[in-house]
């Protein structure tokens, strides 16, 4: 079920909120757990046993780790059970066939692919990391094991962040899970509705609209667009315009989803961590990764980079740790070589900055921003060049070997205003404007209502457009 659909906006969400608010205090987590399972099963009912198994494995492992507190060997054994259970499911569904295909191509073997796992369980990359962080935190004694399986299940499958994050650690919400009375306030409800509306507007008014430009330029096989160009027919300037449009689409799509999820979390009385902080204003690749998908970066920093030694064991070890993290980041995004190349690409950039470049970037004013945006856009070209119909080789040939073809002027004329608005919305200017408007109740309410009505009208009049990060 997608947030930006009629069935979610006008059926699931209002019914769930009504049941949640009307439920007795002690039953709120039960209502949240059951409604979240309905949300997950709506389009993925065949993966319901996977979700249940993941909950049970980590719930039981957490209890056993805590129970055998004075027996290190048993604690490690049950941590291993949790890690193998969570990572094993992720590997089986997401990477098994990729490994088999790669082995066949590289080694000349003839391994048969596993049948029946062509479809990836929605959100498995996200909720697997949540269960992993829980079991590791219990092992490290950072949190107490959750004894109520309903409360633990509610944490794992909480629908606002289930499918595409933000990645929420158990300790971020454990206290709120156990506040049964006065869990939410009117201020939280207002903040939640505001964030949800802004996120919805980001998705349907910006991401989907700018995505149409990308589709028109690059195209897909079944595109109904009458302005379909196709990559082979596009000129180099037009391809650059297309990949810039994709960069904007990806940001508004993913940050819009995160904002909607954080907003719904507030409506339910939970404070989820922020996931984006204007990444396209960054003045270095290092800063970009502090602002982009912050919960994923934070997860890898806490559970991989720091345990490997972090910055404590010399420069060579730092570079190695960075290599591991960026490689895993690429692999996390998808079972495809382009994602691995994308991760290694960022490793090289981050390593260069760490070795010598960052000190010069910090002294500059304009050129560091241009440098960062250029390299990020090139990175997104790697990101999108996979098996979705976009040829990796042809895309990079068009980008870096000047070629003629369809001019970008038609698209600039039709999408110029949207591009300008999108660029402005990538900066803190809109937030500053909102902070001025929100001081007066009338302008605050009117702004939210107008955005909600216009966004809803677009939802009603458009076809279903899934969030891009659902694929990961």
Predicted region positions:
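Membrane-embedded transmembrane alpha-helical bundles that form the catalytic cores
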Residues: 1-471
């Amino acid at each position: 079920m997608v947030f930006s659909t009629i069935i979610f906006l006008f059926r699931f969400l209002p019914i769930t909120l009504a049941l949640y608010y009307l439920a007795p205090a002690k039953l709120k987590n039960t209502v949240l757990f059951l409604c979240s399972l309905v949300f997950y099963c709506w389009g993925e009912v065949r993966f319901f046993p996977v979700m249940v198994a993941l909950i049970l494995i980590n719930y039981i492992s957490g209890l056993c780790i805590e129970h055998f507190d004075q027996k290190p060997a048993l604690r490690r054994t049950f941590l291993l059970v949790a890690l193998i259970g969570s990572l094993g499911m992720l590997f089986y569904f997401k990477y098994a066939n990729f490994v088999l295909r790669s082995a066949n191509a590289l080694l000349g073997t003839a391994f048969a692919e596993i049948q029946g796992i062509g479809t990836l369980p929605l959100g498995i990359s996200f909720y697997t990391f949540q269960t992993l962080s829980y079991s590791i935190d219990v092992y490290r004694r950072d949190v107490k094991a959750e004894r109520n399986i309903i409360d633990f299940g509610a944490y794992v499958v909480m629908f606002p962040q289930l499918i595409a994050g933000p990645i929420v650690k158990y300790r971020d919400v454990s206290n709120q899970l156990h506040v049964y009375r006065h869990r939410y306030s009117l201020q939280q409800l207002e903040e939640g509705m505001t964030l949800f509306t802004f996120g919805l507007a980001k998705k349907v008014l910006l991401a989907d609209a700018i995505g149409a430009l990308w589709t028109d330029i690059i195209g897909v096989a079944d595109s109904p667009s009458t302005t379909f160009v196709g990559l082979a027919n596009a000129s180099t300037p037009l391809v650059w315009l297309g990949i810039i449009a994709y960069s904007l689409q990806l940001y508004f799509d993913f940050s819009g989803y995160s904002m909607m999820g954080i907003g719904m979390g507030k409506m339910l009385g939970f404070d989820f961590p922020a996931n984006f902080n204007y990444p396209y204003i960054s003045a270095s690749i290092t800063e970009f990764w502090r602002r982009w998908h912050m919960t994923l970066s934070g997860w890898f920093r806490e559970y991989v980079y720091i345990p490997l030694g972090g910055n404590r064991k010399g420069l060579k070890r730092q570079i190695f740790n960075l290599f591991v993290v960026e490689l895993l980041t690429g692999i996390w995004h998808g079972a495809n070589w382009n994602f691995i190349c994308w991760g290694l690409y960022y490793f090289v950039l981050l390593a260069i900055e760490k070795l010598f470049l960052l000190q010069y970037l910090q002294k500059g004013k304009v050129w560091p921003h241009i440098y960062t945006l250029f390299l990020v856009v090139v990175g997104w070209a790697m990101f999108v060049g996979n098996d979705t119909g976009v040829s990796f080789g042809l895309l990079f040939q068009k980008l870096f070997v000047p070629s003629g073809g369809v001019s970008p002027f038609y698209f600039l004329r039709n999408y110029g205003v949207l591009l300008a608005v999108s660029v402005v919305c990538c900066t803190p200017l809109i937030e500053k404007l909102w902070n001025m408007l929100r001081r007066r109740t009338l302008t605050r309410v009117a702004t939210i209502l107008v955005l909600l009505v216009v966004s809803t009208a677009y939802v009603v009049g458009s076809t279903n457009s899934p969030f891009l990060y659902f694929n990961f």
